[in-house]
Swiss-Prot record:
InterPro entries attached to this UniProt entry: Ergtoxin (IPR012622), Scorpion_toxin-like_sf (IPR036574)
Family: Belongs to the ergtoxin family. Gamma-KTx 5 subfamily.
Listed GO CC annotations: extracellular region
Comment block on domains: The presence of a 'disulfide through disulfide knot' structurally defines this protein as a knottin.
Disulfide bonds: C5-C23, C11-C34, C20-C39, C24-C41
Subcellular location: Secreted
Lineage top rank: taxon: Eukaryota
Keywords attached to this entry: Disulfide bond, Ion channel impairing toxin, Knottin, Neurotoxin, Potassium channel impairing toxin, Secreted, Toxin, Voltage-gated potassium channel impairing toxin
Protein name: Potassium channel toxin gamma-KTx 5.2
Primary role: Reversibly blocks Kv11/ERG potassium channels.
Tissues where this protein is expressed: Expressed by the venom gland.
């Protein structure tokens, strides 16, 4: 889920990050972005 992606995907302060995006996609989101070193998932896909 969204929170597990935050825990697994440490990242730079801002911008896209591969692990973050991949984690979010597996969780059913369209992708993810890094905000203040945390992975934030985008809108859910296919719902």
């Amino acid at each position: 889920d969204r929170d597990s992606c935050v825990d697994k995907s440490r990242c730079q302060k801002y911008g896209p990050y591969g692990q973050c995006t991949d984690c979010c996609k597996k969780a059913g989101h369209t992708g993810g972005t890094c905000i203040y070193f945390k992975c934030k998932c985008g809108a859910e896909s296919g719902r």
